[in-house]
Amino acid sequence: MMKAFKKLAIISDCVHFISPNGIAATENHIFLRQMEVLAKHFSHTIICCPFVEFSDNKIYTEYTGAIEFYATPNVGGNKVSDKLTILKTIPAWLKVFKKIKRQADCFYLRFPDNLNIPGFFYFNFTKKILFASYAGTWKNYPGEPSTYRFQKYLLKHFFKGPVFAYLEKDEPKYHLYKTFSPSYFQETWEEESENVALKINGLHEGKKDIPVFISVGAFNAQKNQQFILEALKILHEKDIDFKCYLVGDGPLKQQYAAFIAGNSLTGKIFLMGKLKANDLRMLYRKSDFLIQASLIEGYGKVPVEGYFHGVIPFLHKTQMTNVILDNGKCGFAFEANDPVIFAQFLMETIQQKSLLAEKIIAGRNFSKGLTLEKWSARIVETVQNFYER
């Protein structure tokens, strides 16, 4: 545990706003939960982040803890004009950095975040306690933005504090430590025990219910929901009954809606839009299988959420898939190359009731170590040990 007097400042690009209730809020409820549980280890916490105007279409969560906020400009994008805008806002960020430097003695820099590049140089040469995280794919990949690679290079070779990243194992030589991205508390795990037991009993009894699939993520090419739609179309053409919930929103929503309508799938595949955390939990409870076909992924939080609810994941093979599946104990990996092959694999696998029950039990046991409490405790313990050595 960090000493009680430690005051934490978090620098992030997570967009916030003030809700109609006059309370700081964000659409990224996972970020909110993680920062609130981390803040419990400190006497006071500041979050330095962009603020925008509130709009009625936002699906948001309000903060409940006593966290102080410093607003910064909301900028970003990949166009040259976007980069120039970012450069123009650096003085405003530096002004905020100067303020929080006087108020906190421990600083948490979250990457990837272009505006944390000046944050890196500003704080890395102070005598303050520092730690950072990189919430993206750590290994380089084709098409990766050059600024992402630059940030990883800085963190690995020059950052003076511990860095938490999605790794298969710790790399103390480079002060890199593996982490994960939790959504739920231990209490949530306990709450789902009865519902999960019913799922397992149903498998043991050989019940032939309609399989229910779920996939969660932004509707874009990287998340690759089109591959899932193609595979489910094949199941439909083979007269296999099922339901599938696609949760999210994004630029490909209309394309997906047209595909569903054009292939007579409107009674089987449902576009759910963005959901509040509790509404998503209700869908997980109804679901049997999770399909994530993301082409690039860090430590996907969605499969872990599935484990809590007894949902068995099918994950496209990416850098961390083997770790997330606990070496295949908790789910199944596939190559998102040919929807015909995947559809056949899916049809064969979901019939193996005993195997599926084993996967649910393994996922539940695995997820016990992936709670918000475990995540925050590991960070605090690692930071303390790092600076006391």
Features from the language model and the residues they span:
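Short alpha-helical donor nucleotide-sugar binding micro-motif in glycosyltransferases
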Residues: 100-101, 274-275, 282-287
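Conserved acidic donor-binding segment of nucleotide-sugar-dependent glycosyltransferases
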Residues: 327-328, 332-339, 348-353
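A short, well-ordered alpha-helix in the C-terminal region of glycosyltransferases
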Residues: 265, 341, 348, 355-369, ...
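Short glycine/serine-rich donor-binding loops of glycosyltransferases
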Residues: 300-303, 321
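Conserved donor-binding/catalytic core segment of Leloir-type glycosyltransferases
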Residues: 199-223, 229-232
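Short hydrophobic beta-strand element within catalytic cores of glycosyltransferases
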Residues: 312-315
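Aromatic "clamp/platform" in nucleotide-sugar-dependent glycosyltransferases that forms part
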Residues: 295
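Nucleotide-activated donor-binding/catalytic signature segment of Leloir-type glycosyltransferases, i.e.
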Residues: 257-275
